[in-house]
C-alpha cells in the first residue's frame, strides 16, 4: 500500500491517535513501539474502541481488512505527516530554541488566530512523534500552521524540517539547554541552526531578533523579517520594554500590557508582534490577543497561596533560563523575597560546573533566602547565611513542615523532572 493510499484512508477519519486510552470514534490509530510497550498489541483494542483503521508493523497482530500492515509504523507516521503537509499546501511557521518555545508558540497562535483559522502544536509535542501528530491535526480549514520543534541532538531539527517543510522559521535563542546531547553550547548553536540551513536552502523566510548577535549574524543573507529594541531599521522597532513584574511593550503606536512576568519574556512577545504584523493582523488585534493571554502549566505563572505571592516557573530549567529568571527576580521591587530552585537536567559532564555557577551567581547577587533542591545543587553546598541545600525534594519538604514560609514573594523554578510545583501543597 502506497503512502497516498494510506493518506486516502486517513482522510476518511476524524483524527490520528497513538494512544488507545484516548481513542475516539473514527480515529486513525498508528501503533508506535515505545520503550516500555509495543502498541501493536493494542491494535484490536483500538478497533473495538472505535478506530476505523489501525497501522501496525507486526503481522502477528493483524485483525481484519481495517488493519494496515507496514514495515515501520513510526516511519509511516512521519511519511504520512509529510504527505499530508504537501497535500494541504498551507503556510507553516516553525520555531525552535533553547528557551521560550512553547510560550512563543502560544503567543503567535493567539495573535494569528485573530485573523486566520490557525492550528498549533498542542503542549510541547515537539519531537519526531509530536511534530507528525501536529501536522496531521491540520485540515483543509487550517489557514496557517504553527509547529514547535524540540531537539537534544544534532540533526533532529533538520529531520523535523524535512517533515514539516516550513515556509517561515523563528529561533527564540541559543542557550545552555540539553548540553549532554548537543555536546556543549557550540553544539546547541549548530543544532538549532539547522532550521536556518533548511530555510535558506529552500528560499524561505526567517523571523529574526536583531538584538541577538548570533541570530543577526547567521541570518544576514536570508530573506528575513526583523524586530529590535535598538535598531530602528528593523521591520518592527520596539520603542520601550518594562517589567515589574508584568511585561509592558510599546511598539507600532500602542502600549501592550501582558500577563507575562520578566524581561526574559519580552522577546517572546516581540516575536509574536512581529509575526502578526507580517501577516497583517491589525495592531489593535495584536494588542488584544497578547493582553488576553494568561500563561499556565507552571510557566511564569503569578499565584497567591496563603500569604505568599509566588512566581511559578517550574515547567523546565537550564542554566540560561535559570539566570534570566533569577536576574528578573532580583530586580523585582518586592520585600521579603525567597527562591526555591531545583536541579537542572541533561547537562552531562557540565552539570556540576553549571550548578556551581548558579550558586555563585546567587552568592554574589542576592541578599534573600535561597533554597537549593536536588543532588547537583547539594553537591555544590556552601556555607552562607540564608542559603539552604537539600539532597532531595523530600528533604526540602521536611524543612517546610518545620518552618512555615509566610508573607514572602517566592520564585519556584527547576527542571521538569524535579516537579517543584509540588511545593505549593506545603505552602
Regions found by a protein language model. Name each.
Residues 32-37, 295-298, 314-386, 415:
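Active-site beta-alpha connecting loops in nucleotide-dependent enzymes
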Residues 95, 297-299, 417, 421-422:
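ATP-dependent carboxylate/acyl-activation modules
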Residues 408-425:
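Peripheral docking tails and interdomain loops at the edges
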Residues 63, 76-206, 210, 214-223, ...:
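Phosphate-binding loop of NTP-binding sites
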Residues 27, 46, 80, 95, ...:
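Residue-level signal for inorganic ion chemistry
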Amino acid at each position: 500500500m502506497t503512502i497516498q493510499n494510506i493518506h486516502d484512508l486517513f482522510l476518511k477519519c476524524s483524527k490520528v491517535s497513538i494512544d488507545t486510552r484516548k481513542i475516539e470514534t473514527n480515529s486513525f490509530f498508528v501503533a508506535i513501539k515505545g520503550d516500555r510497550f509495543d502498541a501493536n498489541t493494542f491494535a484490536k483494542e483500538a478497533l473495538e474502541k472505535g478506530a476505523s483503521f489501525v497501522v501496525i508493523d507486526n503481522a502477528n497482530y493483524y485483525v481484519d481488512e481495517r488493519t494496515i500492515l507496514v514495515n515501520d509504523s513510526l516511519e509511516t507516521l512521519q511519511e504520512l505527516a509529510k504527505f499530508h503537509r504537501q497535500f494541504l499546501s498551507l503556510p507553516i511557521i516553525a520555531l525552535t530554541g533553547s528557551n521560550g518555545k512553547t510560550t512563543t508558540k502560544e503567543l503567535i497562535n493567539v495573535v494569528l488566530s485573530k485573523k486566520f483559522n490557525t492550528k498549533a502544536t498542542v503542549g510541547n509535542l515537539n519531537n519526531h512523534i509530536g511534530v507528525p501528530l501536529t501536522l496531521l491535526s491540520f485540515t483543509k480549514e487550517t489557514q496557517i500552521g504553527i509547529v514547535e520543534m524540540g531537539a537534544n541532538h544534532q540533526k533532529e531539527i533538520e529531520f523535523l524540517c524535512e517533515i514539516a517543510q516550513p515556509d517561515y522559521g523563528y529561533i527564540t535563542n541559543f542557550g545552555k539547554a540539553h548540553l549532554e546531547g548537543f555536546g556543549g553550547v557550540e553544539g546547541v548553536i549548530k543544532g538549532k541552526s539547522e532550521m536556518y540551513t533548511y530555510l535558506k536552502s529552500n528560499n524561505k523566510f526567517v523571523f529574526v531578533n536583531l538584538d541577538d548577535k548570533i541570530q543577526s549574524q547567521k541570518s544576514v543573507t536570508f530573506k528575513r523579517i526583523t524586530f529590535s529594541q535598538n535598531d530602528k531599521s528593523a521591520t518592527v522597532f520596539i520603542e520601550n520594554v518594562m517589567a515589574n513584574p508584568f511585561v509592558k511593550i510599546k511598539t507600532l503606536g500602542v502600549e501592550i500590557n501582558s500577563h507575562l512576568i520578566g524581561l526574559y519574556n519580552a522577546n517572546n512577545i516581540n516575536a509574536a508582534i512581529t509575526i502578526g504584523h507580517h501577516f497583517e493582523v491589525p495592531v489593535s488585534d495584536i494588542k488584544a490577543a497578547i493582553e488576553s493571554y494568561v500563561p499556565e502549566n507552571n510557566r511564569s505563572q503569578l499565584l497567591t497561596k496563603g500569604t505568599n505571592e509566588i512566581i511559578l516557573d517550574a515547567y523546565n530549567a537550564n542554566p540560561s533560563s535559570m539566570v534570566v529568571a533569577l536576574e528578573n527576580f532580583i530586580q523585582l521591587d518586592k520585600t521579603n523575597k525567597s527562591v526555591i530552585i531545583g536541579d537542572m537536567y541533561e547537562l552531562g559532564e557540565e552539570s556540576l560546573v553549571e550548578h556551581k555557577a548558579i550558586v555563585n551567581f546567587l552568592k554574589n547577587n542576592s541578599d534573600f533566602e535561597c533554597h537549593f533542591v536536588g543532588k547537583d545543587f547539594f553537591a555544590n553546598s556552601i556555607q552562607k547565611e540564608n542559603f539552604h541545600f537539600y539532597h532531595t525534594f523530600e528533604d526540602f519538604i521536611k524543612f517546610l513542615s518545620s518552618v512555615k514560609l509566610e508573607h514572602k514573594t517566592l520564585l519556584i523554578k527547576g527542571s521538569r523532572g524535579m516537579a517543584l510545583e509540588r511545593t505549593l501543597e506545603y505552602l
